[in-house]
Amino acid sequence: MTAGVGPDLATASGAAGVRGWSPQRMWSVAGAVVLVACVWGFYAWDGAQTTAVLGGTVRAATLLVLGAMCGMIGERSGIVNIGIEGQFLMSAFTAFTVASMSGSLFLGVVAGVSTGLAMGWMLAAMSVGLRTDQIIAGTVLNIAALGLTSFFYDRGRSLGQPKYQSIELGPLADLPVVGTALFNRPPLTYLALVLVVVLHVLLLRSVWGMRTTAIGEHPGAAATVGIDVIRLRYWNVTLAGGLAGLGGAYLALESVGTFTRAMSGGRGFLALAVMIFGRRTPLGAYAAALFFGFTTALQGQFQLNDTFDIPAQFVGMLPFVVTIIVVAAAGLFGRMRDPAALGQPYEVR
């Protein structure tokens, strides 16, 4: 009799655990299952195209997650950053320019990251120091970056060398379906993945992460226990700009291999959607970035193959339409609470 109760209890416990899931978690799991099933189905139908789509997914997701991490550090600190688009664009320009003039991709990356840090500091100076409206401050960065890069853009300039090439990670690169897409990538892609894991641990497990959360939720209370709110917000927003700068360098030197006007193409705003859908956590943002990257890669594959005879304008809208649907669904099935002090300037008393 007792032996027969065990499986029933286990089944009941498992069912209760599933029933305890939030709607958003259930939809996320269901979406992941459907996505994996679609990938395997496509692979069985056409392995070469599936590998190309998965490679494009990782390539697009890398830029998005770098922008999302930039945004989440700022928002966890209480600062809204809609200037990621401008940080991407300006950093891509300086990275490409320095790399083409010096002949060194590494110096190009350093220039891109430095530009991101400088723009992060400017955002901090306007939002934290001058207590300017944070939306306006981010908009200023976007407009300035677009204007400056368009003015100084040299159509005839080329990189003068191959962009960053892929590095195989031994036998892992030979795995079916995911081997080439995940384990045969250029170096900045691997660096971005390492940063995702490191930042996730730091934000959720370190003293710095707890202090960052504190100044984004209750800056006044944080100040009473000795946290310098102004200084930490300055540091966080500036360092977050470095992540966007790395994203710009990645875009110019690894993903595309050149610079063109307005080449960020709205990806900074997509990164904000990725951050929201990933619930302001790096691992969650990377999962969301893979989803959005998949739609971007699918869009590119449709345009290359012209499989379904869909007008190019409608295909180009795909990532942004998916963004609207996903963000709306996230709000419908369990809206995430913003940090209590998000967007509010802090004054020392």
Give, region by region, the residue ranges found by the protein language model.
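Cytosolic-side transmembrane-helix boundaries in multi-pass membrane proteins
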Residues: 1-38, 217, 224-231, 302-349
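Inter-helical junctions in multi-pass inner-membrane proteins, predominant
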Residues: 45-56, 154, 203, 240-273, ...
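Single transmembrane alpha-helix segments in multi-pass membrane proteins
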Residues: 52-109, 117-135, 276-280, 329
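Hydrophobic alpha-helical segments embedded in the membrane of multi-pass proteins
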Residues: 60-72, 86-93, 114-121, 197, ...
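Short, non-helical or kinked segments that cap or interrupt transmembrane helices
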Residues: 73-94, 128-141, 211, 235, ...
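Transmembrane helix-bundle core of multi-pass membrane transporters
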Residues: 145-205, 305-315, 339-349
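Helix-loop-helix "hairpin" substructures at the membrane interface of multi-pass membrane proteins
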Residues: 181-259, 282-283, 287
